[in-house]
Amino acid sequence: MTQDEMKKAAGWAALKYVEKDSIVGVGTGSTVNHFIDALATMKADIEGAVSSSEASTQKMKALGIPVYDLNSVDKLSVYVDGADEINGHMDMIKGGGAALTREKIVAAVAEKFVCIVDNTKQVDILGKFPLPVEVIPMARSYVARELVKLGGDPVYREGVVTDNGNVILDVYNLKIINPKELEEKINAIVGVVTNGLFAKRGADVLLVGTPEGVKTFTA
């Protein structure tokens, strides 16, 4: 089974967490694209979706799934999204696709976070994948200096502007032993919008595509 086939299996497995007549929170990325394809098969049974990125919004609209503004929605029963890394405590690094802030906002609203990944994303310790930090453009150099003080090697992701008009610093060489603490420390730096650690709001359910099929883990 190829990596993409494992992603597809995880994406389709998430359908069982979608409630009838609900509005579904939808994340961003290659695994989520498979979930969107799956969601389109039951679009008549749901009210619609809230999206965490322009890319996912366009894909859903093209498939005929109604997309709502989060401000017009009182609650989301479920949010389905991928991860760049996830540990055994359901803490994640996300934001490889630069949609981390909107992903974090939608995740905060949702009652349940279902994370869908292939088995290459499971790790014991977070940090091998560079940690994305979304930054107000004028604060980029200052934030980079502060991130160095925290032990990281920040690299400006050139040519990338987020959906919110900000820039991304990817922080390398972090061995993240206490994800919640580091998430709070980075978010406390003036000029940081948010960072890609999802530890304060981790996943509730993890669906992992493996060569043997989809494995389910719960927090």
Swiss-Prot record:
The lineage of its organism: Bacteria, Pseudomonadati, Pseudomonadota, Gammaproteobacteria, Alteromonadales. One of its GO terms (biological process) is D-ribose metabolic process. This is Ribose-5-phosphate isomerase A. Disulfide bonds: none annotated. Belongs to the ribose 5-phosphate isomerase family. Pfam families: Rib_5-P_isom_A. InterPro entries: NagB/RpiA_transferase-like, Ribose5P_isomerase_typA_subgr, Ribose5P_isomerase_type_A. It comes from the Bacteria. GO terms for cellular component: cytosol.
